[in-house]
Amino acid sequence: LRDLMSQSRTREILTKTTVDHVAIIKKYTSGRQEKNPALRMKWMMAMKYPITADKRIMGMIPERNEQGQTLWSKTNDAGSDRVMVSPLAVTWWNRNGPTTSTVHYPKVYKTYFEKVERLKHGTFGPVHFRNQVKIRRRVDINPGHADLSAKEAQDVIMEVVFPNEVGARILTSESQLTITKEKKEELQDCKIAPLMVAYMLERELVRKTRFLPVAGGTSSVYIEVLHLTQGTCWEQMYTPGGEVRNDDVDQSLIIAARNIVRRATVSADPLASLLEMCHSTQIGGIRMVDILRQNPTEEQAVDICKAAMGLRISSSFSFGGFTFKRTSGSSVKREEEVLTGNLQTLKIRVHEGYEEFTMVGRRATAILRKATRRLIQLIVSGRDEQSIAEAIIVAMVFSQEDCMIKAVRGDLNFVNRANQRLNPMHQLLRHFQKDAKVLFQNWGIEPIDNVMGMIGILPDMTPSTEMSLRGVRVSKMGVDEYSSTERVVVSIDRFLRVRDQRGNVLLSPEEVSETQGTEKLTITYSSSMMWEINGPESVLVNTYQWIIRNWETVKIQWSQDPTMLYNKMEFEPFQSLVPKAARGQYSGFVRTLFQQMRDVLGTFDTVQIIKLLPFAAAPPEQSRMQFSSLTVNVRGSGMRILVRGNSPVFNYNKATKRLTVLGKDAGALTEDPDEGTAGVESAVLRGFLILGKEDKRYGPALSINELSNLAKGEKANVLIGQGDVVLVMKRKRDSSILTDSQTATKRIRMAIN
């Protein structure tokens, strides 16, 4: 250009000629895309008949309106067989045209109507002017949606909106079927354009996420008003006027997952227990495993559950409650022994090599650059001093620097919930999270340069413009969360440690937050392992409910395979309620009592078996001790269960046949537990073999007393219990009489059912 401008001829061309006309014409006429829509609109509306309509409109709209203005022209639109129409026709149509039913609008535009309600009932507080530390996070921008995948939603939409279109649609998941049925009913005779309905359904069915700068709440009801609540230098307080199910699902899922991981950690086989609990838990009436498959929430406990189910999860790893994502560099791992300030030897896996990470936590974020056992630079930003300190501690421990290890005072012996020692890195973390004073004092400080937006931080966590902890700076700007939604295949071991394909540990139960929250949706844990979540009373009630629900099978096992019954995991939680010193004695006593019931005529007592069964599950001690009552620890003290008779803990009402445990209903016994008949039947039927249901060929039913007249090997129908009739045969030998009563109970039931 400089060359051209220096020569007079070209200079004249460049400065005097109008810009190339062809280029402009090309620009505005090529392609279907309108290049200047506003201008085009103004220019079109200035014409008399800017709109075209189907010919049928001539029969539906008069040629002139009340003011005598022409509404449409008789001339055809050039190049089509449509009519030219004036904007006045639209006004006429709106005022005088046919009305249509509005019943479907709230149903189709449900998400909009609900948003209006939320805003109407929301409260907007004062506006504050302050620096906003925003970090980009992946957030849900679409309140009130189900969690279907794009493909699942597509199938539902096609089925609802275009049911007659060709194309294979497979509706498999429970949620797909429910939604399809519901929507088909709602949208019968709907006159709204199908395409519009399809768009709106998509909003309702699919989670839409965006990577947005956020300073406050990240649930979808806050994100929908993001433009009203936070600017570059201001924020406006806001309380949403309603909750939406998708936020509730996310929140409840996290709570359920945390509870399950915490519980699984302390069981004999954590992985098997975790899977059993995930499969038997429901959140808001939907199976937890279905939610896990569809819900993209990333949280440590949720990701452990996903990994256990073989689902892919994010490749970032977790340490000290921060999500670490390596942004550059690489390292190899090597075992190394180090000495703490207390001369305790720790075996740590050292990362050798230069690496850079982003660290993102709930209240603080950071950029970390490190080399082998050396922190090079840490830039932190956070909501307050406390949050910034948390991030600094985690980064210092993660750096594995020698001065950090030497700052340990006292012994490291932290254990997890299952009383197992934590690994060395978590030992160090816990130690300094408790008290980081020595760590910060020993770290060292350095003078700092004045850099815009950065200040120093001293060992007592106060800001400074002159000095700072070595390598550490505080920044006004947050560090964005990792934006990629990439998911990787991972493996999980039986102690719930999750590793990527290279063997790096991404997650472990130590990383699961101990924060307790109250779930928004009802979480139903059907697994006996979760009975204790609501305390001792819940364990008591659930144990007895389980026995009553499964009484049919329990009864058979009680008489034929008691050991297997005593070992059932459903009795495990109950043991924690029995005073430690008494467990073995109680168990021995109850087992002996049960054996006598099996051996002695007429002592079979259903209610007593149900009541004492959980006590027999502990390893028994052989002792001659007798008890008239057994103690359980509930409501903060020992309460007694009477061996014979009712008590506030265990109360069976003969009249209603219902059991109440601690005043809570525990269910009804379907059979008649009247001790007499049950015992008498099994007793009287000793010496007889029960063959099956009544057989008319052997004559009318005899009463139990008439049985004694039968000869050995003779068969007869006999009336037992509540008017049931079974076919029996008198045994040919007497030797096997003892085992009869054990099988009698079972056979009677099989014959009757």
Curated annotation (Swiss-Prot):
The keyword Metal-binding does not apply. It comes from Influenza A virus (strain A/Chicken/Hong Kong/31.2/2002 H5N1 genotype X1). A motif (Nuclear localization signal) lies at residues 730-733. Keywords: Cap snatching, Eukaryotic host gene expression shutoff by virus, Eukaryotic host transcription shutoff by virus, Host gene expression shutoff by virus, Host nucleus, Host-virus interaction, Inhibition of host RNA polymerase II by virus, mRNA capping, mRNA processing, Viral transcription, Virion. One of its GO terms (cellular component) is host cell nucleus. This is Polymerase basic protein 2. It holds the Pfam family Flu_PB2_5th. The record marks E621 as: Avian adaptation. Plays an essential role in transcription initiation and cap-stealing mechanism, in which cellular capped pre-mRNAs are used to generate primers for viral transcription. Recognizes and binds the 7-methylguanosine-containing cap of the target pre-RNA which is subsequently cleaved after 10-13 nucleotides by the viral protein PA. Plays a role in the initiation of the viral genome replication and modulates the activity of the ribonucleoprotein (RNP) complex. It is found in: Virion; Host nucleus. GO terms for molecular function: RNA binding. GO terms for biological process: 7-methylguanosine mRNA capping; cap snatching; DNA-templated transcription; symbiont-mediated suppression of host gene expression; symbiont-mediated suppression of host mRNA transcription via inhibition of RNA polymerase II activity; viral RNA genome replication. Influenza RNA polymerase is composed of three subunits: PB1, PB2 and PA. Interacts (via N-terminus) with PB1 (via C-terminus). Interacts with nucleoprotein NP (via N-terminus). Belongs to the influenza viruses PB2 family.
